[in-house]
Amino acid sequence: MSWKLKKKAQALVSSEEGVVRKEWGGRVSIALVYPNTYAVGMSNLGFQTIYDHLNALPHVVCERVFFPDPEDLDEHGRTATPPFSLESQRPLTDFDLIGFSITYEGDYINSVRLLRMAGIPVRAAERGPADPVVMMGGVCAFSNPEPMAAFMDFVVVGEGEEVVSEIVDAWIGSEPAAEGERRRRFIDRLKPLTGIYVPDAYRVGYGPGDLIAEVAPLAPDVPRVVMKRRLQDVNRFETRSVLKTPKAEYGHMELLEVGKGCGRGCRFCLEGQVYRPVRHRSLESLRESVARIAKGSKRVGLVGACVSDYPWIGDLMRVLEEHGVEVSISSLRADSLTEDLVASLQRGGHRTLTMAPEAGTERLRGVVRKAITDEQLYEACDLLRRYGIPNLKCYFMIGLPTETREDVEAIPELAARLLERLQVLGPDGHPFGKLTLSVSSFVPKPWTPFQWAPFDDPRALEDKLDLIKRAARRLDTIRVVHENPREAALQALLARGDRRVADFIELAAGLEGDWRRALREWDGDAAFFTRRSRQAAEILPWDHFDVGVKKAGLLREWERARESVAPAAAAV
């Protein structure tokens, strides 16, 4: 093992507050893997929550593993150092169970790279009795885990707070077992659990046009449809940062979840669908959390699909102020922005507020079911100016269904009007206040009304970005940031693919993550998964899951969107 890498890991752990170290003797050992860098993974509240819940079990030792920083990859290769845990610097092969927490489809390739680096067979079918059991959780696991199915012994479908202890109990209950039998007995004990998907227990058949013909269980005790695991009582588990480190993307700011789900029903939004029903933590529960946070931190970031819709947001802001805690909110809806809320943010030191109009015209906002008017956006700017919050960040998407050139041109035009309402004069007589446009390429996601829509042509998306950037250059205080449309195309492939995409993922992992080259060498057809409209009667790769959203309701919303109709109620 590289002493340089080991020393870096020890330095990271020594800079943390809240790290758990346990003796291994007699305990179930679990490697909790975030397949991205330490800074990204430590900013993920779900990852921290599962780490906390597992280590709260006395018979478990859970340690973290991250994908190496770019500057460390060469050192891993040069010294043949496999991925290892932060807490004890043990290699992945030493653990009983390996759990990948996957939030972004782009991390699929990193996950397989880590298995390769560890010397663990990447395909579940190739692992033997001496290999760790490999599982996957996170939002990608219950949107569409099929591209990763070949690599996983099992998948946690849904919210993991309760099911992790049941997984541990199943592992303990599979002992004693005959030589080589424990893995099979463990998987058999998992199959009846709600929220557990064992890919190897299903056969996928393909028919004419390479479409899925059926997904069938291979045994009578295997459910035909895998039900999502849903946390019934969000107050039962406190969801806040348990590990603090200056190396995370958010630095010393603690994160606090106010609830799960969103009732708005935006037609493009995965999170608003798969985390239903909406569940808010009680004000009293959050009050207790804030009191604990305030003992060690003075900055907190509120986390939720739509924080400004929290029913007691005004009361919560007052609780935070009473404890002298500065608050950050990732994004706010213009139609739920109040004077009291903006005033609280200003007192908390906010310099930038973020909103997500998503589209440049009210027509297209109606199509995507983001019912925010231009006037509401202007009024939000007036509030920011009145309370001295100078900067605004707005999220927009291009490539949305029914989008026209006029919709794209409207983005910088709307931005100019927002900037005009936002800016005030500084002491030198010049306007201060900046507007950032964050423009992303729309990726149709499973479990949304837009799951039948095609992904736009990357070249067309690049042209649209050029149009927006050229128009924005005329305004000095507007900045445009965006992702590469070809990276969005990769995300579309991984989000919408089926089990056949595993070959591409494994190929890219073998090419050290060079997915562009992998796309050229793969014998599959990426456009089949990305650029093709799906038919209403088509079996989708994720149809053998039930996340609480009815396909018929999503289809009705898709038809209404194409008719540019936005009803008052969300699809259920």
Report the location of each language-model feature.
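Short secondary-structure boundary/capping segments
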Residues: 47-49, 115, 149-152, 171-172, ...
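N-terminal [4Fe-4S]-dependent radical SAM core
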Residues: 2-31, 38-39, 205-255
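Conserved SAM/AdoMet-binding glycine-rich loop
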Residues: 32-33, 106, 288-393, 397-436
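N-terminal pre-triad scaffold of radical SAM enzymes
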Residues: 32-36, 54, 242-268, 351, ...
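Flexible glycine/acidic-rich beta-alpha junction loops that bind and position SAM and/or redox cofactors
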Residues: 71, 203-207, 264, 311, ...
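Iron-sulfur (Fe-S) cluster-binding segments and ferredoxin-like electron-carrier domains
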Residues: 268-285
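Glycine-rich beta-alpha loop elements in corrinoid/cobalamin-binding modules
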Residues: 67-218, 446-498, 505-511
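Radical SAM enzyme core and accessory elements
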Residues: 1-22, 26, 30-32, 465, ...
